[in-house]
Amino acid sequence: MKKLNLTDKRNPDYFYSEAIKTLRTNIQLSGQSIKTILITSCYPNEGKSDVVLSLAQEIGSIGKKVLLLDADIRKTAYAGRLGVEEEVKGLSQLLSGQVGLQEVIYSTNFPNMDIIFGGPSAPNPSGLLSENIFKVFLKEIREYYNYILIDTPPIGTVIDAAVIGRCCDGAVFLIEPGNVRYRDAQKAFKQLERSGC
């Protein structure tokens, strides 16, 4: 496993940090069987990836082994956001059989946190994610982590999160106040429920 030094230039305020700690505590209180957690939103640009990164860092800071899995294989952003300049392998390459599991997991300078990047944009993301290989992959890595946080595309715009939800123990659905219509949030939430997550 290759180690990356990631750069996080965000400077969250007290209230944001406390909200992340509350979310972490609620996840812990959900029970030890809740390990694989899908995190999605209704629309793009609601702050989902920031929350996933903050939550992964928070979980790692209390001594729990966490994997941040970027499952947005349509539009990955973590490598650029975290200052990674070298080419990294990712989930899309793993699912399409181009690379093996050990080639996509990167350890980081954040305590107890590993990351799998999304990889190059895939031509048929929901098709790749619905293949049995994704389910087998999650089952295999589950043994090595206390928590796996899966950052998905917004469920209100594409089906990928619902496809991924079939393989998860739980979900966090983020809604940006004032920007998401109630009807759209309800529709997206019902789609997530139908996935069994």
Task: Set out the residue ranges of the language-model regions.
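P-loop/Walker-type NTP enzyme "switch/lid" segment
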Residues: 2-17, 21, 25-32, 41-46, ...
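Walker A (P-loop) ATP-phosphate-binding motif of ABC ATPase nucleotide-binding domains
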Residues: 36
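Hydrophobic positions on the alpha1 helix immediately C-terminal to the Walker A/P-loop
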Residues: 50-51, 55, 160
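Short phosphate-binding/catalytic loops that engage adenosine nucleotides
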Residues: 64-65, 197
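Conserved catalytic-core segment of NTP-binding enzymes
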Residues: 126-197
